[in-house]
Amino acid sequence: MTIHRPLACGILVSLLVAPAVAAGGPEVLAEAAGESWLKLVEDGQYALAWQRAAQLLKYELTQAAFVEMTKKARNETGKLVSRKLRSRKLTRQSPSGAPGRCVVIEYDSVFEKRASAVETVIMVAEPDGAWRVAGALIR
């Protein structure tokens, strides 16, 4: 039997790396989805950000209310200068108190009009398996 070393090594590496990737899975997936959503907000695409948010956020705020609040918040802070991950934590309870997977992500951020801020993004796993933003705030 002939064993092709590059193929065998590739399979072995995949088997060793896959559990490590899966171990951080929910938090990493939630963070990626949250950063995509934050990019929409940074680009001023507030209505689209609302459309791509979790049902919980949409239940709490109409699209018009979300757009108005987000514009006001961004006017107060100015444009994003930098953002660095501070923490991300997986919990088993959604912001509404209902059971469900939730990841709370915090960033140390700098804005044009605010030299130091903590952004908190609350991600929930929705029934379709996607991670979506259920809430976001800047302190």
Question: What is the meaning of each model-derived region?
Answer:
Residues 2-3, 12, 17-45:
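Short, low-complexity N-terminal intrinsically disordered segments enriched in polar/charged residues
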Residues 23-24, 35-38, 53-58, 108-110:
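Second-shell loop/turn segments in exported
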Residues 31-32, 47-100:
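Short solvent-exposed beta->alpha transition segments
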Residues 41, 75, 126-128:
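Structural motif
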Residues 88-139:
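Exposed beta-sheet edge and beta->alpha loop/turn motif
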